[in-house]
Every structure is written in C-alpha cells, then in structure tokens.
C-alpha cells in the first residue's frame, strides 16, 4: 500500500504520515520541482488550507495547489483510491475540507481526517483502517 502525501513547510502532514509507518512518497512542495508520477494504487493524505472561508464562501481554496497539480495529471488521478485530510478544528465547518473536495472530484472515499499532525489515536485508527480495508479500497499493489 502506498501513501502519497502533501505537506507544507510546517511538516504537520509529513509527521503524521511518518507515524503511519507505511510506504510513502511526498508530492514536491515547490512547483518548480520535478512533478511526482505514481504507478500504483495509493491513498492521498493532504492538509486543508484556507480555514474559515465557509463564513463568506469566498476564495475557498482548501486543496493545496501542489495536490491540484498532481491530480490534474490523469495518470496520477487514475491510481487514487481514498483520501485522508488534515486540518485545524479551528476552521470549523472547513476542518478537513480538502478531503471532501478531493473525494467528490475524484469519486473516492474520504476515509479519515485528523487535526494538525494527528495524535496516537489518529495514527492507530487511520493506519488500522487502511491496512484492514486495503483490499476493499483497492490499495493492494497490482501484479505487473
């Protein structure tokens, strides 16, 4: 099972993913970096940006541009099987909003959300759920 993730310079999402102890690869932070191409099913883990905009509904851009660029590649998008989102509960209704957006656009299940870098329970629940449901989610690596 592969975890593809995006993390800002705060590295909150990076720390969460490392605690999952699953094979992972990071989407490049800088748009000038070589784009990531994946060739196997994966779960996407990403942070949510722009908290609090649901009050006005304006300028809502919860999905990081690096993730948008990654998913705009049809090849990459064809391998997404589930999404996990991080965020800040101070965002209120927008907490984990990136997961909702990606789930709807890519037609994959939004399986978990965690706050900041996640706690021990988040890691246990998320990892356990992914491992236990890998076959059901289509996250097992396909034979070539």
Curated annotation (Swiss-Prot):
Listed GO MF terms: FMN binding
A GO biological-process term: protein modification process
Family the entry assigns: Belongs to the NrdI family.
Function: Probably involved in ribonucleotide reductase function.
Protein name per UniProt: Protein NrdI
Gene designation per UniProt: nrdI
């Amino acid at each position: 099972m592969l975890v593809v993730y995006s993390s800002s310079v705060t590295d909150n999402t990076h720390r969460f993913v490392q605690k999952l102890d699953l094979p992972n690869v990071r989407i490049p932070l800088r748009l000038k970096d070589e784009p990531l191409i994946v060739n196997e099913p994966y779960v996407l883990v990403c942070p949510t940006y722009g908290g609090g905009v649901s009050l006005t509904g304006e300028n809502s851009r919860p999905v990081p541009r690096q993730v948008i660029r990654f998913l705009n590649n049809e090849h990459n998008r064809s391998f997404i099987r589930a999404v996990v989102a991080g965020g800040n509960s101070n965002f209120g209704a927008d907490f984990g909003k990136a997961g909702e957006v990606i789930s709807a656009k890519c037609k994959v299940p939004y399986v978990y959300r965690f706050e900041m870098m996640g706690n021990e329970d988040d890691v246990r629940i998320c990892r356990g759920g992914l491992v236990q449901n890998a076959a059901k989610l289509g996250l097992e690596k396909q034979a070539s």
